[in-house]
Amino acid sequence: MPSSTEVATDECDDTELRCRVAVEELSPGGQPRKRQALRAAELSLGRNERRELMLRLQAPGPEGRPRCFPLRAVRLFTRFAAVGRSTLRLPADGVPRAGSVQLLLSDCPPERLRRFLRTLRLKLAVAPGPGPASARAQLLGPRPRDFVTISPVQPEELRRAAATKAPDSALEKRPMESQPSMEAPRWPLPVKKLRMPSSKPKLSEEQAAVLRMVLKGQSIFFTGSAGTGKSYLLKHILGSLPPTGTVATASTGVAACHIGGTTLHAFAGIGSGQAPLAQCVALAHRPGVRQGWLNCQRLVIDEISMVEADFFDKLEAVARAVRQQKKPFGGIQLIICGDFLQLPPVTKGSQHPRFCFQAKSWRKCVPVTLELTEVWRQADQTFISLLKAVRLGRCSDEVTRQLRATAAHKVGRDGIIATRLCTHQDDVALTNEKRLKELPGDVHSFEAIDSDPELSRTLDAQCPVGRVLQLKLGAQVMLVKNLAVSRGLVNGARGVVVGFESEGRGLPRVRFLCGITEVIRTDRWTVQVTGGQYLSRQQLPLQLAWAMSIHKSQGMSLDCVEISLGRVFASGQAYVALSRARSLQGLRVLDFDPTVVRCDSRVLQFYATLRQGRGLSLESQDDEEASSDLENMDPNL
């Protein structure tokens, strides 16, 4: 997210890491013979007087004497880095045959851990330093005294690392028991590929303010219109918090999967929350559920607009009862994200939804509200202004003219046609199945690999990919995960299947609207379920894209979209559909009727109060349109 107002938000650089560490001394056979557990420790990368790359381990308190380990032949195990765990195996005194020391890192903020490991790998790749000196040289030479923290990664080091990548085969064949040479290997780590992300993630001033409040332990609700970077910021927040005690949830399974969490209902363990409070408390006292409540220190809730007020109040009361604390929400820090002007809570029958901000406990649980105002998804100011008006239920003659004009847009090319957003999921399934059958040729089926096949239905509900993906030549598809942001291969990127590999699994080759043709390989999704258990699914990051539902599109950015709003049934639904498009040129609206643009008057009042508290008003967004706009309030209210 480039911007002139970007600021870095990390409190310390990528050469330091604070986490839990277990130090294990291993026998020559690899068996642990001594273990020391440190609940809070600091790891630092640096060099000694001989310019050797070192790792310093510092524990607080009386046992805080620092220990330094040479990194000449370090091995990294990073399979669980995404959940804040990793292992570093260091040969004792840098000699592989002398037994090893193993550092088991846990409860690391995942983003901090990723960048720490990246820095370690890169420094070893570009500046391995001299090999281990002989015993005579060590006795006669100066004693390595000082530990100097290494400098942050420089652009020149990135270029040098990219120019010195070793072939993967050489890494795999390197014998572990060979005699160490006097010249340290250029890359001693058993990794498949050196990935060089661009600069450190940056946040805007608004986003950085939210992160600072979160890291101070403040309960907060941050909001903003579609495309203001709420999901981006939420992922950055989760990467900055220790996994232990942090529970990531969302109101829907798909939204929960995007942040690697679980649904709010699954975490709470009280079903729909319709039962009396005493019964809900009893349900929450079941062993697995109760422990989850007790362990929770920070509760993240995404897509809050779809959470009903009564359910929020019930959760707040259950939290206090189970945790036996009188503080709001049982003392849990709340990190809440969403836009109440988007999709409302789902209710049965003619019952009107009550939004979370109407909950009795809302104000005491969420004392701070911050609004993101800078739009990142769309760059066209005309389109941004149009979406702002639609978000507030305003549909002037000019807005109507612009949206009706999109009916003539040709939003696809090179065999890629627009995705139709539907108000009902049944229409999506029927459309995709019908269009796939109409294509000639053989069906290519790709089955997912689930970590627990017995819980596949849970993964179906929370993953954006299904157990089975069926494709044909010419199938319209959409990426459902970021693969290479700099190349345009992002979540929501549209493409068409142009072939299949002749070997192996016959992986699909997809031509994307951005002009890139890519063979799509299996990726992994991880979700958290009740009791803290993690489930994973491996599948191609694709879904059929002739049609998709408005609900499942929430939070996505789409290249080319076709919308029919004739069956819109909820406030905010038209706005969510329209705001999925990255540009006005990539949007086609069929049979537009300005009466479908409406929003809930209670939500308007909530945001008006919020802005007035900051010395702003909703009218100040666009005074020219405000004078002629029609206020389309939901007629059911």
Curated annotation (Swiss-Prot):
It is found in: Nucleus; Mitochondrion. GO terms for cellular component: chromosome, telomeric region; mitochondrion; nucleus. It is an enzyme of class 5 (isomerase). Residues 620-637 have a biased composition (Acidic residues). It catalyses: Couples ATP hydrolysis with the unwinding of duplex DNA at the replication fork by translocating in the 5'-3' direction. This creates two antiparallel DNA single strands (ssDNA). The leading ssDNA polymer is the template for DNA polymerase III holoenzyme which synthesizes a continuous strand; ATP + H2O = ADP + phosphate + H(+). Its main location: nucleus. Keywords: ATP-binding, DNA damage, DNA recombination, DNA repair, DNA-binding, Helicase, Hydrolase, Isomerase, Mitochondrion, Nucleotide-binding, Nucleus, Phosphoprotein. The keyword Nucleus applies. The keyword ATP-binding applies. Residues 1-180 are annotated as: PINT. Residues 159-184, 618-637 are annotated as: Disordered. GO terms for biological process: DNA recombination; DNA repair; mitochondrial genome maintenance; negative regulation of telomere maintenance via telomerase; protein-DNA-RNA complex disassembly; telomere maintenance. DNA-dependent ATPase and 5'-3' DNA helicase required for the maintenance of both mitochondrial and nuclear genome stability. Efficiently unwinds G-quadruplex (G4) DNA structures and forked RNA-DNA hybrids. Resolves G4 structures, preventing replication pausing and double-strand breaks (DSBs) at G4 motifs. Involved in the maintenance of telomeric DNA. Inhibits telomere elongation, de novo telomere formation and telomere addition to DSBs via catalytic inhibition of telomerase. Reduces the processivity of telomerase by displacing active telomerase from DNA ends. The PIF1 N-terminal (PINT) domain enhances the interaction with ssDNA through intrinsic binding activity, it also harbors DNA strand-annealing activity. Belongs to the helicase family. PIF1 subfamily. Monomer. Interacts with telomerase. This is ATP-dependent DNA helicase PIF1. It comes from Rattus norvegicus (Rat). The lineage of its organism: Eukaryota, Metazoa, Chordata, Craniata, Vertebrata.
